């Protein structure tokens, strides 16, 4: 599992990336690649009172979640999450930003593709959703018009409507 957040119902919502393998690069352990024991990406709900675990999302519009990474709830009770995807020998999934409800009834892909959608967070006023794009070292900010809806394009191919915040 990667990111976790407490939902409005007091349960913990987990971004489970399904597992990956570790690489030792000059003594530094780096996560990467889909492991042999990969179990599929998913969003899980953990009831802290009973200990029960329920899988609430495994796909969006027929596309499987590959590596859910980080999650944040908004004041409306829904949540935003990123999916980093998985890397393979000579190819890599594109990442994405999603919006969903904790009841398991609504999930929407909001931005695709994102090279390596990692961290996600809301501005204090919850009018901007921030996405850390790790590989290129960038932080993107998208104006929110309503829960699960941003202003501007859904692709990084066109930059109007989104704010490039930082390049490392």
Name these PLM-found stretches.
Residues 1-168:
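Sequence-structural signature of mature extracellular/luminal beta-sheet repeat domains
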């Amino acid at each position: 599992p990667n990111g976790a957040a407490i939902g409005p119902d007091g349960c913990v919502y987990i971004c489970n990336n399904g597992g990956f393998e570790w690489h030792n690069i000059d003594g530094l352990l780096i996560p990467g690649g889909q492991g042999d024991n990969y179990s599929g990406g998913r969003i899980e709900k953990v009831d802290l009172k009973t200990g029960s675990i329920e899988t609430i999302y495994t796909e969006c519009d027929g596309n499987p979640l590959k590596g859910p990474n980080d999650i944040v709830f908004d004041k409306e009770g829904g949540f935003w999450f990123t999916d980093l995807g998985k890397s393979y020998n000579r190819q890599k999934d594109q990442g994405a930003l999603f919006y969903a409800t904790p009841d398991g009834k609504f999930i929407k892909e909001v931005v695709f593709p994102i090279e390596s959608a990692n961290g996600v967070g809301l501005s204090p006023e919850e009018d901007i959703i921030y996405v850390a794009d790790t590989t290129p070292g960038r932080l993107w900010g998208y104006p929110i018009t309503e829960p699960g809806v941003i202003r501007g394009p859904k692709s990084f191919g066109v930059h109007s409507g989104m704010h490039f915040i930082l390049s490392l």
